[in-house]
Amino acid sequence: MLVIGADTFSKVTDWNHRDCVVFGDGAGAVVLERNDRENGLFSSILLAEGEGMNEFTVFPGDAYFTMNGKAVKEKATTAVPECVREILRLNGLGLIDVSMIVPHQATLGVLKRIAEVLDIPFSRIQTNLESYANTAGATVPLLLDQVNRRGLLHTGDLLLLVSIGAGWTWGASLYRW
């Protein structure tokens, strides 16, 4: 199975707005296949609610995206930690069992707040904002590739991949490396 995440925010960004520096274009992909080993993707959850549909969107007829930064930050810093706790609970695991968290790259402030809410050191959260900014749907596969290329992944590591998107949609997966 091929999982692709890609976004081109440069096409819907107002370059005169202060939020223009937060986003970047990107694409990432992951190939998943069934195996008999004990590694790989073994649990996922996905949640959605429509109440945030106007908080981050491109409205019909508009050239640029509109974002309510306060609402986005509030949702990300509550939904992501709740999602992390839920996937761990469903699998009888704790944060102590997780080798690293590979999250959606919203902003550095959002990621730091998520670490605070989860009561973990920020060093447990992987980032690549400094290289690519927020590439939306591409952030998790891009970051996973970067972490792998840096040699930070070891056989048996438990990765927690977590993301949030417009609308609101959010989810998490557990992956044994």
Give the ranges of each region predicted by the language model.
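Active-site histidine-anchored catalytic micro-motif
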Residues: 1, 25, 137
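A short, small-residue-rich loop immediately preceding and capping a beta-strand
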Residues: 1-7, 157-162
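Acyl-CoA/ACP chain-elongation machinery
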Residues: 4-5, 51-55, 108, 137
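Condensing-enzyme catalytic core mediating Claisen C-C bond formation in acyl metabolism
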Residues: 9, 15-78, 82-85, 164, ...
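Short glycine/serine/threonine-rich phosphate/pyrophosphate-binding segments
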Residues: 9-12, 169-171
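Conserved active-site "lid/cap" helical segment
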Residues: 15, 58-99, 109-119, 143, ...
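Claisen-condensing/thiolase-fold acyl-transfer catalytic domains that form or cleave C-C bonds
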Residues: 99-177
